[in-house]
Amino acid sequence: MGLLTGDLLGILALAMVIFLLLVDLMHRRSRWAPRYPPGPMPLPGLGNLLQVNFQDPRLSFIQLRRRFGDVFSLQQIWRPVVVLNGLAAVREALVSHSHETSDRPPVFILEHLGYGPRSEGVILARYGKAWREQRRFSVSTLRNFGLGKKSLEEWVTQEASCLCAAFADQAGRPFSPNNLLNKAVSNVIASLTFARRFEYNDPRMLKLLDLVLEGLKEEVGLMRQVLEAMPVLRHIPGLCAKLFPRQKAFLVMIDELITEHKMTRDLAQPPRDLTDAFLDEMKEAKGNPESSFNDENLRLVVAHLFSAGMITTSTTLAWALLLMILHPDVQRRVQQEIDEVIGHVRQPEIKDQALMPFTLAVLHEVQRFGDIVPLGVAHMTSCDIEVQGFLIPKGTTLITNLTSVLKDETVWKKPFRFYPEHFLDAQGRFTKQEAFMPFSAGRRSCLGEPLARMELFLFFTTLLQAFSFSVPTGQPCPSDHGVFAFLLFPSPYQLCAVPR
């Protein structure tokens, strides 16, 4: 009987192996299609998981691009992936085929966070009616902000003053600016979403920031890729909660803030912020099962604004200050322009940037060199498309290697150096560059770009109006190489802020 049982188990195991190989074979069929992008041979049942460094995929993509060209394919277990490199390929996919590449891959593994057909937020939402509804709402709310007592620019200007006060408290001693930058930018998002600000030592502020930063680390690594490619694994009890505890805790905090905000709402008054405006839309959509305005989606829209809106802008500012202490000649030229255009009596205003071409060029070069979101957010094809002569089938995940655009050697004079002149013409006037894509491109480009540009200019100029920054005496010059954790953070550093 034991022998029979052993034989039966052997047969079942063999049948399972054959079944998995057949499934794997079916998912490889796209590789045999004419003009499908080349790529490394995937392993049965694993695809190319062991051939890509998921702690920092950029390193693997550099090698694969040299071997296979600007458009190459990967197999994420059974999910087909195409990586796009260089300005020509990325522009063709995201701009020329904007409609066909505006979808997102499904995020089944985030169901434990409340994602579903009617609650996808904005950033990760599938391309369709709900996304268009939320994108339109978010853009119009950002544009029309000012329904409350303060305009968005006034909020940023006020927060920049608070940030300067916090820098002054360091009394010229060496310190890392990262935490203070995170707090300042978070308060701008808090003003937009909850019409309030937090004191920099507020325990809730500190916890919120910690959860955002630690939650980012849950976005990278091999296990995350396995779960995305085999979403059936999400049904293993407790697995997702164990792998993404900080993302869950972050959403719990957002729920608490929304609940408190609802209790203070005066319906006789106009909306104070985005949350109030969303609640008004929910009231109008009541009874419409197709509407994306619901409690579940409110928490995700607010969460996306907080996480994406805070960390990208504060990280860019951290890069800006690092590059200023590494390039004091550039810092002096920015300060000279500030002195000539703004002076020392009043604070910078957004209208000043039209008269400050060098400062504007420096901020653009910070974003290009810093390369904050190197791989963008994944897209997915909604139909067969052709890019650079290759046929990419419907349902293929697209990774846009924005690093390869921002550091494209065929476009930039000095792609791997910090060189503000990339954005200046021969007469010293600011000039735009087509390959400047830190916010991506096409229909899914970052909706918060106008807010980010305002924050970067006002925070940066206010800080350089008030302080001169330098490497602390006795410390070596910090590295200008980044640390990858979904975003690209500057290597840890300290600086001294001396009042001017």
Curated annotation (Swiss-Prot):
Tissue note: Found in liver and kidney.
Stored Gene3D superfamilies: Cytochrome P450
Cofactor dependency: heme
PROSITE patterns referenced in this protein's UniProt entry, alphabetically: CYTOCHROME_P450
Membrane topology according to the record: Peripheral membrane protein
Location relative to the cell: Endoplasmic reticulum membrane; Microsome membrane
InterPro entries tied to this protein: Cyt_P450, Cyt_P450_CS, Cyt_P450_E_grp-I, Cyt_P450_E_grp-I_CYP2D-like, Cyt_P450_sf, Cytochrome_P450_fam2
Chief location bin: endoplasmic reticulum
Molecular-function annotations in GO: cholestanetetraol 26-dehydrogenase activity; heme binding; iron ion binding; oxidoreductase activity, acting on paired donors, with incorporation or reduction of molecular oxygen, reduced flavin or flavoprotein as one donor, and incorporation of one atom of oxygen; vitamin D3 25-hydroxylase activity
Short name of any one Pfam family annotated for the protein: p450
Keyword hit for Membrane: yes
GO BP field: arachidonate metabolic process; xenobiotic metabolic process
Binding site for heme: C446
Coiled-coil parts of chain: none
EC main group: oxidoreductase
Any one annotated GO CC term: cytoplasm
Reactions the enzyme catalyzes: calciol + reduced [NADPH--hemoprotein reductase] + O2 = calcidiol + oxidized [NADPH--hemoprotein reductase] + H2O + H(+); alfacalcidol + reduced [NADPH--hemoprotein reductase] + O2 = calcitriol + oxidized [NADPH--hemoprotein reductase] + H2O + H(+); dodecanoate + reduced [NADPH--hemoprotein reductase] + O2 = 12-hydroxydodecanoate + oxidized [NADPH--hemoprotein reductase] + H2O + H(+); dodecanoate + reduced [NADPH--hemoprotein reductase] + O2 = 11-hydroxydodecanoate + oxidized [NADPH--hemoprotein reductase] + H2O + H(+)
Role played: Catalyzes the 25-hydroxylation of vitamin D(3) (calciol), 1alpha-hydroxyvitamin D(3) (alphacalcidiol) and some C27 steroids. In addition the enzyme catalyzes the hydroxylation of positions 11 and 12 of dodecanoate.
Protein family according to the UniProt entry: Belongs to the cytochrome P450 family.
Protein name as annotated: Vitamin D(3) 25-hydroxylase
Source organism (scientific name): Sus scrofa (Pig)
